[in-house]
């Protein structure tokens, strides 16, 4: 299974955005790790498993931060 190519500059921009928006750098790191771990076990049969869980967590969390209307609450 080939990993899709991730634009490094885009990934770094999103990571910096998350860290800058967080009050605590350690806490946002733990939140990303927990989301990745949770998604890894929830989506065992998911076909979108091409991205590593931590990359998906970073992209999801930065999207949620930028577009809060995509959160279904």
UniProtKB/Swiss-Prot annotation:
Record Pfam families: RNA_pol_Rpb6 (PF01192)
Highest taxon, organism lineage: Bacteria
Molecular-function annotations in GO: DNA binding; DNA-directed RNA polymerase activity
Zinc listed as a keyword: no
Reaction equations catalysed: RNA(n) + a ribonucleoside 5'-triphosphate = RNA(n+1) + diphosphate
GO CC terms in record: DNA-directed RNA polymerase complex
GO terms, biological process: DNA-templated transcription
EC annotation from Swiss-Prot or TrEMBL: 2.7.7.6
Keyword Nucleotidyltransferase: yes
Keywords: DNA-directed RNA polymerase, Nucleotidyltransferase, Transcription, Transferase
Role of this protein: Promotes RNA polymerase assembly. Latches the N- and C-terminal regions of the beta' subunit thereby facilitating its interaction with the beta and alpha subunits.
Family the UniProt entry places it in: Belongs to the RNA polymerase subunit omega family.
HAMAP family from the UniProt entry: RNApol_bact_RpoZ (MF_00366)
Complex formation: In cyanobacteria the RNAP catalytic core is composed of 2 alpha, 1 beta, 1 beta', 1 gamma and 1 omega subunit. When a sigma factor is associated with the core the holoenzyme is formed, which can initiate transcription.
Name of protein: DNA-directed RNA polymerase subunit omega
Organism: Gloeobacter violaceus (strain ATCC 29082 / PCC 7421)
